[in-house]
Design a protein with these regions (language model features):
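Sec-dependent N-terminal signal peptides of Gram-positive bacterial secreted proteins and lipoproteins
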Residues: 2-25
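Hydrophobic alpha-helical segments, especially transmembrane helices
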Residues: 3-6, 65, 244
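Structural motif marking the loop-to-transmembrane transition
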Residues: 3-4, 101, 105, 385
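Active-site-adjacent loops and short helices of periplasmic peptidoglycan-processing enzymes
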Residues: 21-186
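Domain-terminus/edge residues, biased toward the C-terminal soluble/receptor-binding domains
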Residues: 166-398
């Protein structure tokens, strides 16, 4: 019995060692409730997992992430914001502000992001843009700058809207991209992490307290920021950023259930974060490959005799910055970053120093994640009639 028990212990030890050396591949993402979902690398912007990631859908109050960012970038916290009739008439959820009331912009940002007040969003939009329509134009301009490909904002609060550009919508991928940008703003993060906030209008006669509706902050370790949303058309929506195991993830969910299924978004967000933690690790660009030397015809041979006759070889340089080399990418264990070059087989003189000759590309899963120009390290002159005369003179008279 002792021998068998010892053998069993040895067997189990061997299994554990093998599992540590060859860890099993983590399971794929379990079935999600959301109609559209994205898990994004918050540092590189790469989509790690997508379900209908590029499908245009209404996104309800997750719109307010963009509203808040523009207010932070274009306004000042101590600005006086006056409430218009249009702002005061917005439907629930609302702060209940009255036409003519004044607030500090900073206070309204807490109302906007913690309790998701629709009247607050319109008041902010009118203050920053002059009107809701002009503010929507700023929102759409910013979305394009961030790389969004199918986003159109009409309202600052995410309520259904339509104009000459189409209906109010985004995609899970674009929404994740917007959050990846927003999480870099420390004031945005501070506001959205606040659990409770009390403020008054400028007169000091009316006080308000708002509570954060983003329960995921206290449900999941590492959640940095997030924004919930719901309309009858959009369903429950959610976008958040989380840093887990030193990895920055962005989760975006659209159409994640309707009334009666309010907690579906928390379940889906957890599944995506678990998938990211268990499947991805950080890597940087690999060592820059050695670039070939390009033959140049009709060129003055150099003094190092690297060329012969009327040709020489051109050394190349790839301008890869330290910032690019330090940038991190989340990769699966089975993924690698590879280099590819686009270079001509030969050139004709003259060639200028730093002249662009081609390009160097880093690719991950067949998609380009980085590129830079490849340039000439030195200049190469073209052989001329005068060069031939001087050459003959040197060869025969010296």
């Amino acid at each position: 019995m002792k021998i068998r028990r010892a053998a069993a212990v040895a067997f189990m030890t061997a299994v554990l060692i093998i599992q540590q050396i060859f860890p099993a591949q983590a399971a794929e993402v379990q079935e999600l409730y959301a109609l559209s979902a994205v898990l994004m690398d918050g540092e590189s912007g790469r989509v790690l997992y997508g379900k209908e990631a590029y499908k245009a859908r209404p996104n309800a109050s997750t719109t307010k992430v963009m509203t808040c960012i523009l207010a932070l970038e274009l306004g000042n916290g101590d600005d006086y914001v006056q409430v218009s009739k249009e702002a005061a008439s917005q439907p629930q959820t609302h702060l209940g502000m009255k036409e003519g009331q004044q607030f500090y912009l900073e206070d309204l940002l807490y109302s906007l992001m913690l309790k998701s007040h629709n009247d607050t969003a319109v008041a902010i939009a009118e203050h920053i843009g002059g009107s809701v329509k002009k503010f929507a134009a700023l929102m759409n301009q910013k979305a394009k700058e961030l790389g969004c490909t199918d986003t159109h904002f009409v309202t600052p609060n995410g309520l259904d809207g339509e104009d000459e550009g189409g209906i109010h919508h985004t995609t899970a991928r674009d929404l994740a991209l917007i959050m990846a940008y927003a999480v870099k703003n420390s004031t945005f993060v501070h506001i959205t992490q606040t659990r409770d906030y009390t403020f008054s209008d400028i007169s000091g006669k009316k006080y308000y307290t708002v509570h954060n509706t983003n329960a995921f902050l206290d449900m999941e370790t590492g959640v940095i920021t997030g924004k919930t949303g719901f309309t009858g058309n959009a369903g429950y929506c959610y976008v958040c950023a989380a840093r887990q195991d030193e990895k920055l993830f962005i989760v975006a969910l659209l159409g994640c259930g309707w009334p009666g299924n309010k907690n579906y978004k928390w379940s889906d967000a957890r599944k995506l974060l678990s998938y990211g933690r268990n499947n991805y690790r950080y890597a940087v660009l690999p060592e820059i490959p050695r670039l070939p030397e390009i033959p140049v015809s009709d060129a003055v041979p150099d003094n190092r005799e690297r060329g012969s006759g009327t040709g020489t070889l051109l050394k190349l340089h790839a301008a890869v910055s330290e910032k690019a080399l330090a940038k991190r990418y989340l990769l699966k264990k089975t993924e690698t970053i590879t280099w590819e070059t686009e270079l001509p087989g030969k050139l004709e003189a003259p060639v200028r120093k730093n002249q662009r000759i081609g390009s160097l590309h880093a690719k991950l899963d067949g998609k380009e994640i980085f590129s830079c120009p490849v340039t000439a390290e030195d200049k190469i002159s073209r052989i001329t009639y005068k060069w031939y005369v001087d050459k003959v003179f040197q060869d025969y008279f010296h």
